[in-house]
């Protein structure tokens, strides 16, 4: 593992995880793609037994704030969610109805070899102050990127759960 990418598991901390689409391409720019991600995340939450404290799905990256799962490690969650989402979204593109134009996963005329970047960033959240800091950071992300004017307008985050405003797409644990 490269220097500076150590992972600390087994301490009971929450994990603030960031991972990106391949080459930071906006492969999650469509609402349908973000919906697929959220559905798969909800399924894995149940299967692996981790607590989902917060999340935001952006067009080219994702932030999660999770506990360590009962089965596996946070890296197991990432491995499974990345695999499932990539398979579903690639399958969807291949199975477009006859007569409908299908755009391959490619950028600049070059075939796309991967859906996700191989690595991910994992920060141990060891205090309530850090938990709030990371939640505020992720919930502000769509506004900071000028995708929306207010977090309530970006349903692919846990902001609606904490404010009780808007739609909650996946159950949040507190």
Where are the model-predicted features located?
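Short catalytic/metal-binding and nucleic-acid-binding patches
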Residues: 1-174
């Amino acid at each position: 593992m490269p220097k500076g990418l150590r992972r600390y598991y087994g301490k009971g901390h929450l994990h603030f995880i960031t991972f990106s689409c391949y080459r930071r391409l906006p492969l999650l720019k469509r609402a349908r793609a973000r919906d697929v991600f959220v559905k798969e995340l909800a399924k894995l939450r149940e299967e692996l037994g981790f607590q989902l404290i917060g999340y935001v799905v952006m067009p080219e990256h994702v932030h999660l704030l999770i506990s360590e799962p009962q089965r596996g490690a946070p890296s197991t969650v990432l491995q499974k969610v990345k695999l499932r989402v990539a398979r579903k979204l690639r399958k969807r593109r291949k199975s477009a109805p006859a007569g409908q134009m299908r755009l391959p996963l490619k950028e600049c005329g070059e075939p796309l070899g991967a859906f996700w970047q191989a690595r991910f960033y994992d920060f141990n959240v060891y205090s309530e102050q850090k938990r709030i800091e990371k939640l505020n950071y992720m919930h502000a992300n769509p506004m900071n990127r000028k995708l929306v004017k207010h977090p309530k307008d970006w349903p692919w985050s846990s902001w609606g759960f904490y404010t009780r405003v808007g739609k909650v797409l996946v159950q949040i644990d507190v």
